[in-house]
């Protein structure tokens, strides 16, 4: 051997006697190994090639006659790794070259000499401990193949030991490789050799420790059991997991453990088990960050789900399966015509190709010419391929991984520009979210945070996200309802975002109309002067207030007199005075009319030193305002340059932020109202206002002048007008929130139910934020009535009304004076009603009936209305106030049962809270739905669903909105309010029933569909109409006439 080695050494530029590494004397071998380490550190990475190192090591490992040669070959690897030459050795040992010694080292695990076997395992461990972690993917296929197929148990056991070392040395990379690891280890646990079985079990336990998902941490032992003993453990584990709420991101280690369980579970026979699997698959898939995470399991999981949806009998379980299929297709980007089993293989980057790219880029950036076969450069190509194939395009990772190996080939060259350009190229090719835009480095940074996390309670909102904000930019923060937009802004203002600059460095202001009810009587000027955060003099404050529309007179008005639009302008005035570096605006156009929205756009676009982060569902406002879009999706925050239109070019599926398209799988459904006594067409008026005028107590200006109008079931009314024109006041008078105080009358049908959502929609739930929507509904409707109705002005008795009622409570009956106690019941009386009245101190047998007009004349109008409301709800066939029915009702508004029954309303997003308010307002099946600014906080998808639901609603609709797109898509009638006067157009007001279609007679084909126990519709046989006696006589006469003519005719009795 020595002559061959010497010849190899002398033929190259380097010189080293390799034979000394394989002599019998161990001390001499060790000395030679140290000498080689010194020599290679001086001469560089190509020294190994020059002396023929790989060929000599492979030859020595295969020398069955010389134990010292085999042992020496293993020892020199360990010596080089332990003495500072590991990085120089890596490109030669870990490569795709045919003469790499790695396979021979693995075969040495089965050497008959124990010392050689021990040295071989130690050598491979030394390589694994010192190598770059991204090289793990190069070694792993060989290890897994030997564990699965080797006929020698020693090699299997040794490979499992190395696998354990890999898990320790490169945990992140091994976590990514879990889809490949788990099946091999689960099989190896059943090996016939106890040593292999024991090693496999230990390795599997170590591998599952890589699962960091807090949702399933406690279930990991059960999941491992189900892998090892599927027949008995799978049903139990599925039951355990089905009760789990997934809130943490689902990564490769997590899905590697759960997917085999789901695949096996779908092969079980019980429908309940299959349904639970579908629920788990759906919930889990929603939290998968990338298609590549779920891709390995699609060929087995998706076809089984499709088969389940086609064969399962229970319709509800079928719908759950279909939901899981839709989610899995979306996450895995599987075409509609594919079942996931025929997906094309993912593109694979090759090390030599990337090494060629490096050669060209080095030359482009002024480097010297270098051969792509250079070990350092070729190995950098291998590592770059490993990064690309595992979709890691993080700049820091590339800059820390590749330059050290490029430096081996080009010691004096700065390789960072070449690495960055290749990273950008590969990221663009992969269409990854990590791709950077050309303007990324332009402008002054206000904040540059990398790898931060954000959670709300147990729910993960952002995971390893980056956020970079430039001075003077206007960022539109986009994402679905519930994705965490408002939570992120609250976290910024409350200093809860790790790495965000403190207030002493960057002044941040949250624009919101946060006016406390206790401050309603304070003047506008005093309220602003009282804000100690504002760095402004009283004169500056006054001039700023004037600049946004608050003249001297208006500054003296109380805050409580401001409409929603003026409150938002006041909040913006405070933001101007705060002199902020960053403005946070959450739905700033809420309650603003068109003119004020234009003013806001002009103001924001004029700011050159102030940065804005804007959350808004007004697509036109965003399109005209923002310079960049921050997209909050899949736990990441990605910046896209340009406005909303440009953003849609980059992310086509985000069109839902820009267009009002109703999604098939996301629709709202409003409950249709019951019939009303005496109402035979949709044109008949149910609510009338005649010559009503109104002025708020304490206000110097009258709000409404001589208003007359009416509302019917066919009404589709848009109430339009500038801020402060009296729109909300008008609606409050119609719904009974307030009462006319300057003359006029408001009349409504005694059984009419109105569903009302106020301008500040959240005021309905403000006192119940720590309750779940379920608990709120149980409280609000606990008596069968709407408890919110009890606080309306038309239900609260004034002192004058109490005095009048007390005076009119005396009834003379049979010469005896009686005092009215309560109104007990009601019944029809011609065109009106009469009411059963009980008397104080008398039994129910003494009750009498009094007409409505008489009771109203006696001052009992509000008591009459109270009884009318109870009767209206009873006639509305109120559904049972139970959990299942409430969950089903909210489901019609896109709110999952999970949020209804298990999440407090404080933790819900703005959009989800609006859905709660909408659901609560429509629980009583209202005849008229009145919505004051309903588009606030709803995303475009929810807005489209609401529009479609209102179009299909069988009752009347009143809408106050500044969103023209919303109003024009629903309303045919316009009530234009201008300085307290009403101009109505497009209406169809009639006296009496009108000429519309009759609604009081049920059509013959309107019978309700009945369902069997599984929910499938029952097709009923039509009942034959029974003949009357006259019909029978007529039929008999007809038969006799036909017989007389010679025809052969028989009756049923004769047959």
Swiss-Prot record:
Q: Pfam families attached here?
A: ABC_tran, HEAT_EF3_GNC1, HEAT_EF3_N
Q: What does the record give under GO molecular function?
A: ATP binding; ATP hydrolysis activity; RNA binding; translation elongation factor activity
The reaction(s) this protein catalyses = ATP + H2O = ADP + phosphate + H(+)
According to the lineage, what is the superkingdom?
A: Eukaryota
Q: What SMART domains does the entry give?
A: AAA, CHROMO, TOG
Start-end of each HEAT repeat = 48-86, 96-133, 134-172, 176-213, 218-255, 257-290, 296-337
> Which pathway?
Protein biosynthesis; polypeptide chain elongation
**Gene Ontology CC annotations of this record:** cytosol
Basic residues bias: start-end ranges: 1033-1044
Which PROSITE patterns does the protein's record reference?
A: ABC_TRANSPORTER_1 (PS00211), ABC_TRANSPORTER_2 (PS50893), HEAT_REPEAT (PS50077)
Which keywords does this chain's UniProt record carry?
ATP-binding, Cytoplasm, Elongation factor, Hydrolase, Nucleotide-binding, Protein biosynthesis, Repeat, RNA-binding
Compartmental location: Cytoplasm, Cytosol
What this protein is reported to do is described as: Ribosome-dependent ATPase that functions in cytoplasmic translation elongation. Required for the ATP-dependent release of deacylated tRNA from the ribosomal E-site during protein biosynthesis. Stimulates the eEF1A-dependent binding of aminoacyl-tRNA to the ribosomal A-site, which has reduced affinity for tRNA as long as the E-site is occupied. Assists translation termination by stimulating the release of nascent protein from the ribosome by release factors. Appears to localize calcium-channel protein CCH1 to the plasma membrane.
Which protein are we looking at?
A: Elongation factor 3
Which organism is the protein's source? Cryptococcus neoformans var. grubii serotype A (strain H99 / ATCC 208821 / CBS 10515 / FGSC 9487) (Filobasidiella neoformans var. grubii)
């Amino acid at each position: 051997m020595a002559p061959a080695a010497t010849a190899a050494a002398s033929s190259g530029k380097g010189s080293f006697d390799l034979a000394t590494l394989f002599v019998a004397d161990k001390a001499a071998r060790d000395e030679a190994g140290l000498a080689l380490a010194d020599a290679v550190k001086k001469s560089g990475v190509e020294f190994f090639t020059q002396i023929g190192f790989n060929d000599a090591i492979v030859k020595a490992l295969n020398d069955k006659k010389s134990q010292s040669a085999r042992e020496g070959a293993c020892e020199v690897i360990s010596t080089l790794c332990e003495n500072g030459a590991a990085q120089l050795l890596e490109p030669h040992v870990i490569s795709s070259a045919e003469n790499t010694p790695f396979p021979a080292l693995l075969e040495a695990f089965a050497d008959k000499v124990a010392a050689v076997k021990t040295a071989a395992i130690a050598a491979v461990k030394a390589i694994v401990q010192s190598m770059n972690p991204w090289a793990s993917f190069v070694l792993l296929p060989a290890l897994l193949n030997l564990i699965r197929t080797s006929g020698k148990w020693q090699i299997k056991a040794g490979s499992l030991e190395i696998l354990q070392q890999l898990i320790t040395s490169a945990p992140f990379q091994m976590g990514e490789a879990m889809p490949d690891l788990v099946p091999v280890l689960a099989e190896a646990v059943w090996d016939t050799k106890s040593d292999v079985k024991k090693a496999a079990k230990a390795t599997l336990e170590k591998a599952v420790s890589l699962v960091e998902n807090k949702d399933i941490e406690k279930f990991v032992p059960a999941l491992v059991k189900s892998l090892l003993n599927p027949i008995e453990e799978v049903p139990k584990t599925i039951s355990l997991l089905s009760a789990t709420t997934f809130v943490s991101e689902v990564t490769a280690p997590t899905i590697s453990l759960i997917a085999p369980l789901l695949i096996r579970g779908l092969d079980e026979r019980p429908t309940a088990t299959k349904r639970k699997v579908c629920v788990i698959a759906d919930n889990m898939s929603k939290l998968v960050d990338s298609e590549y995470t779920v891709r390995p399991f699609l060929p087995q999981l998706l076809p089984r789900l499709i088969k389940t949806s086609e064969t399962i009998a229970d319709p509800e379980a079928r719908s759950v399966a279909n939901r899981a299929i839709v989610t899995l297709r979306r996450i895995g980007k599987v075409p509609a015509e594919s079942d996931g089993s025929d997906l094309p293989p993912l593109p694979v980057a090759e090390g030599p190709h990337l090494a060629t790219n490096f050669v060209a880029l080095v030359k482009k950036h002024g480097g010297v010419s270098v051969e792509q076969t250079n070990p350092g450069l070729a190995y950098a190509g291998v590592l770059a391929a490993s990064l690309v194939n595992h979709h890691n395009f993080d700049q820091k990772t590339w800059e820390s991984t590749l330059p050290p190996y490029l430096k081996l080939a080009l010691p004096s060259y700065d390789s960072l520009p070449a690495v960055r350009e290749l990273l950008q190229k590969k990221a663009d090719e992969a269409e990854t979210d990590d791709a950077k835009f050309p303007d990324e480095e332009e402008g002054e940074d206000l904040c540059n945070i990398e790898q931060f996390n954000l959670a709300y309670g147990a729910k993960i909102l952002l995971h390893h996200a980056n956020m970079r904000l430039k001075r003077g930019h206007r960022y539109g923060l986009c994402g679905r309802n519930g994705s965490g937009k408002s939570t992120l802004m609250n976290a910024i203002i409350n200093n809860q975002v790790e790495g965000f600059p403190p207030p002493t460095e960057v002044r941040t202001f949250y624009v919101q109309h946060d006016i406390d009810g206790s401050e309603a009587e304070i003047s506008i000027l005093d309220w602003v002067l009282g804000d100690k955060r504002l760095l402004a003099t009283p004169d500056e404050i006054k001039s700023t207030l004037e600049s946004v529309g608050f003249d001297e007179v208006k500054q003296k008005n109380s805050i409580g007199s401001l409409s929603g639009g003026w409150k938002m302008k006041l909040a913006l005035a405070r933001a101007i005075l705060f002199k902020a570096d960053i403005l946070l605006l959450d739905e700033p156009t809420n309650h603003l009319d068109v003119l004020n929205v234009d003013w806001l756009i002009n103001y924001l676009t004029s700011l050159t030193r102030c940065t804005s982060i804007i959350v808004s569902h007004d697509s036109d406002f965003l399109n005209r305002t923002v310079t960049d879009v921050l997209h909050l999706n899949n736990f990441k925050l990605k910046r896209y340059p340009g406005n909303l239109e440009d953003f849609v070019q980059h992310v086509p599926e985000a069109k839902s932020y820009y267009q009002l398209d109703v999604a098939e799988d996301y629709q709202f459904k409003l409950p249709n109202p019951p019939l009303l006594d005496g109402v035979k067409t949709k044109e008949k008026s149910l609510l009338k206002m005649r010559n009503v005028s109104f002025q708020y107590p304490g206000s110097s200006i009258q709000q409404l002048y001589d208003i007359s109008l009416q509302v019917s079931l066919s009404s589709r009314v848009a109430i339009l007008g500038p801020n402060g024109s009296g729109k909300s006041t008008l609606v409050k008078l119609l719904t009974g929130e307030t009462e006319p105080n300057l003359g006029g009358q408001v009349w409504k049908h005694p059984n009419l139910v109105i569903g009302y959502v106020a301008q500040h929609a959240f005021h309905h739930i403000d006192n119940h934020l720590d309750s779940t929507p379920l608990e709120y509904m149980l409280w609000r409707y606990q008596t069968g009535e709407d408890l919110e109705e009890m606080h309306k002005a038309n239900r609260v008795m004034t002192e004058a009304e109490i005095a009048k009622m007390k005076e009119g409570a005396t009834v003379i009956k049979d010469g005896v004076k009686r005092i009215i106690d309560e109104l007990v019941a009601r019944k029809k009386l011609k065109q009106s009603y009469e009411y059963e009245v009980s008397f104080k101190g008398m039994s129910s047998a003494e009750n009498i009936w009094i007409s409505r007009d008489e009771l109203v004349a006696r001052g009992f109008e509000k008591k009459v209305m109270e009884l009318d409301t109870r009767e209206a709800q009873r006639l509305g066939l109120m559904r049972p106030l139970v959990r299942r029915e409430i969950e089903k009702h909210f489901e019609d508004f896109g709110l999952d049962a999970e949020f209804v029954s298990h999440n407090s309303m404080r933790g819900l997003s703005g959009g989800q809270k609006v859905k709660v308010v909408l659901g609560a307002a429509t629980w009583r099946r209202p005849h008229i739905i009145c919505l004051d600014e309903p588009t606030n906080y709803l995303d475009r998808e929810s807005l489209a669903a609401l529009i479609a639901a209102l179009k299909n609603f069988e009752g009347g609709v009143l809408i106050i909105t500044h969103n023209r797109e919303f109003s024009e898509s629903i309303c045919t009638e316009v009530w234009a309010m201008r300085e307290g006067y009403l101009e109505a157009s497009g209406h169809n007001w009639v006296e009496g029933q009108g000429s519309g279609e009759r609604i009081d007679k049920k059509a013959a084909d309107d019978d309700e569909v009945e369902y069997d126990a599984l929910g499938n519709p029952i097709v009923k046989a039509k009942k034959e109409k029974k003949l009357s006696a006259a019909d029978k006589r007529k039929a008999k006469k007809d038969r006799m006439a036909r017989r007389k003519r010679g025809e052969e005719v028989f009756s049923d009795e004769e047959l």
